[in-house]
Amino acid sequence: PQHPWYQRGRKRLKEYRALETAGGWSPISTGPTMKPGMSDPRVPALRYRLTVSKDLEGTLEAPTPPYDTLYDPALEAAVKRFQQRHGLTPDGAIGPGTLQALNVPVSARIDQIRVNLERSRWVLHELHGNFVLVDVAGFNVSYFRDDEPVWTSKVIVGRPYRETPIFKSTISYVVFNPTWTIP
């Protein structure tokens, strides 16, 4: 497909394969929750990880002391971008959930990209112009006009035992603020 999303995915796959060839990234060690303004010996590893994933702009050169272990505002913004992209609460804190997402190996990320590219092949060739897209995993819905997002909102989806069905359909009408009674 020639859809821009698919092409971005292919580019990202190429980048991640190059990262894998170069050795990927090492896991960041566990420890207490890192918060902005703190100094922590894990910060250089965090900087490297967020730079290779392009959440943090800059080079892979090590900062000079005392900034090498300081969790500064630029790093906080990068962490929030990473958290947002991975469906985590973008609070800037490196707790267990964020650390787990950061430590997913590059090979697993490549597998995720490949699966999503395959899904895209089935869906994106039919998406153009105006459409609504529900991101079940991200708990949000977006309205696109001329292939650009113009509105996004949080959405409630199913549960593991009552999964939201995946489908595509033409929308004939929308009901805002429907009546709802407790079952």
Q: Regions from the language model: what does each represent?
A:
Residues 1-168, 172-183:
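Auxiliary tRNA-acceptor-end handling modules of aminoacyl-tRNA synthetases
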